UniProtKB/Swiss-Prot annotation:
Cofactor remark from the record: Binds 1 FAD per subunit.
GO molecular function: NADH:ubiquinone reductase (non-electrogenic) activity; NADPH dehydrogenase activity; oxidoreductase activity
Transit peptide boundaries: 1-41
Domain of life: Eukaryota
Designated name of the protein: Internal alternative NAD(P)H-ubiquinone oxidoreductase A1, mitochondrial
Main location: mitochondrion
Chain positions of motif Microbody targeting signal: 486-495
GO cellular component: mitochondrial inner membrane; mitochondrial matrix; mitochondrion; peroxisome
InterPro entries membership: FAD/NAD-bd_sf, FAD/NAD-binding_dom, NDH-2, NDH2-like_C
Family of the protein in this entry: Belongs to the NADH dehydrogenase family.
Length: 495
């Protein structure tokens, strides 16, 4: 990366010429100071080697892979008086996934569901030995306590990816999971997932583009129906919530602002079994009835093949579409699959204290991890509440280890870790459109408990998630967006 090498050369020159450094303007000085602290220690022969192993008189370093619910909760609670924190992730923000579907149709703006890492853990922006790196971890050297990284340069054609290494005292793998495609041909090429902000942006742009294209003179009736047929594959909470938001958008906004094509737009939800299979039976029936009333067509079937303009089901049915959203759950990522460590149903195998027992000083939390069979515990579902609770527990455990002098590499073997992690399910919620939602407060599918449906549940759903939004800034954004949508309708700008 030529520009990066040149900066390192400049930094060396500035370091050697103290008088020149003192003449730098006060505005530029703090930025160069932080850059010098990185390059002066870790540059060799014009190549950035990375962050070297910490010394005994330095704070131990925790490296967190990922910026999802698990990793961000851990970084928020970790004691930065004990540890230096380094986060490596291909995105510089956490996505508040429960509200992501609302951004696809303009109910909320994208910034309302994105929380910058520097706001969650200010140390990565302010402390000299804590960093956030916009990069992917390609490999882990467990024996030498080191990870191999490569910078993310998506959309920047002029920059080459830069490889560097980071040594760790404690490593937390919280890299999440990838969308399951079940090996179905054409899914990755033609479907849109709903896990990241850029996915929601893509859905919104394509939806609005199809609405505008269908209104162009000369477009056939058949093509209008195809362009405005929105297909959602997967009847879990994400698929159902997106279908509900989309039906609301059609009934309230499309009918007003795209009156010429309002009779052509439809939503189809395809699921192999029952929708919302983890919810109470009564709530599933209620959701089915409400979605049907909202105009959502429910189809039970298996997708066999995805083509650019249509889906082929296992029974041979051909389903044309203009927008295809794929939401069939998650599975192990290629990175997790590449790690040579014991697995639990494809996930990284962990013990009761969230450690990876086959290697020293490595922990794993969130969707990428699962309890080993030897623990006698079931693999937990890939839910935000599971990931967040694991992050909170592990931060407390690592703070305890650090206070007892076990923060550095290979120093925690004889420390009492206390009680193991225990997960208690707090219930499930899902919105289904038309100011209605489901609230299932049972601890498990077989247990008894309170279940609610309707407008009261919608109020509970909004209140609960509003309190979970990380910062006051985003809480205010969400409230303003909800109020604006209620009074003026959704934003239909295609930006």
């Amino acid at each position: 990366m030529p520009w990066f090498k040149n900066l390192i050369k400049i930094s060396k020159t500035i370091t050697n010429q103290s008088s020149s450094y003192k003449s730098i303007t006060p505005l530029a000085s703090p930025l160069l100071t932080q850059f010098l602290q990185f390059t002066k220690q870790y540059s060799t022969n014009d190549h950035v080697v990375g962050l070297e192993a910490t010394k005994s008189d330095q704070k131990p370093r925790i490296v967190v892979l990922g910026s999802g619910w698990a990793g961000c909760r851990l970084m928020k609670d970790i004691d930065t008086n004990i540890y230096d924190v380094v986060c490596v992730s291909p995105r510089n923000h956490m996505v508040f996934t429960p509200l992501l579907a609302s951004t696809c149709v303009g109910t909320l703006e994208f910034r309302s569901v994105a929380e910058p890492i520097g706001r969650i853990q200010p140390a990565v922006s302010t402390q000299p030995a804590s960093y956030f790196f916009l990069a992917n971890c390609n490999a882990i050297d467990f024996d030498n306590h080191m990870i191999e990284c490569e910078t993310v340069t998506e959309g920047v054609e002029t920059l080459e990816a830069w490889k560097f290494n980071v040594s760790y005292d404690k490593l937390v793998i919280a890299s999440g999971a990838h969308a399951l495609t079940f090996g179905i041909k054409g899914v990755n090429e033609h479907a849109t997932f709903l896990r990241e902000v850029h996915h929601a942006q893509e859905i919104r742009r394509k939806l609005l583009l199809n609405l505008m294209l269908s209104d162009v003179p000369g477009v056939s009736e058949e093509e209008k129906r195809r362009l405005l047929h929105c297909v959602v594959v997967g009847g879990g909470p994400t698929g159902v919530e997106f279908s509900g938001e989309l039906s609301d958008f059609i009934l309230k906004d499309v009918h007003q602002r795209y009156a010429h094509v309002k009779d052509y737009i439809h939503v189809t939800l395809i699921e192999a079994n029952e929708i919302l299979s983890s919810f109470d039976d009564r709530l599933r029936v209620y959701a089915t009835n409400q979605l049907t009333k909202s105009g959502v067509r429910l189809v039970r079937g298996l997708v066999q093949h995805v083509q650019p303009d249509n889906i082929i089901l296992s029974d041979g049915t051909n389903v044309p579409y203009g927008l295809l959203v794929w939401s069939t759950g998650v599975g192990p990522s290629p990175f997790v699959n590449s790690l040579d460590i014991p697995k639990a149903k494809g996930r990284i195998g962990i013990d009761e204290w969230l450690r990876v027992p086959s290697v020293q000083d490595v922990y794993s939390i969130g969707d990428c991890s699962g309890f080993l069979e030897s623990t006698g515990r079931q693999v937990l579902p890939a839910l935000a509440q599971v990931a967040e609770r694991q992050g909170k527990y592990l931060a407390s455990l690592l703070n305890k280890v650090g206070k007892q002098g076990g923060g550095h590499a290979n120093c925690a073997q004889n420390i009492n870790l206390g009680d193991p992690f225990v997960y208690k399910h707090l219930g499930s919620m899902a919105t289904i459109g038309r100011y209605k939602a489901l609230v299932d407060l049972r601890e498990s599918k077989e247990a008894k408990g309170v279940s609610l449906a309707g407008f009261t549940s919608f109020f509970v759903w909004r209140s609960a998630y509003l309190t979970r939004v990380v910062s006051w800034r985003n809480k205010i954004y969400v409230l303003i967006n909800w109020l604006t949508t209620l009074v003026f309708g959704r934003d239909i700008s295609r930006i």
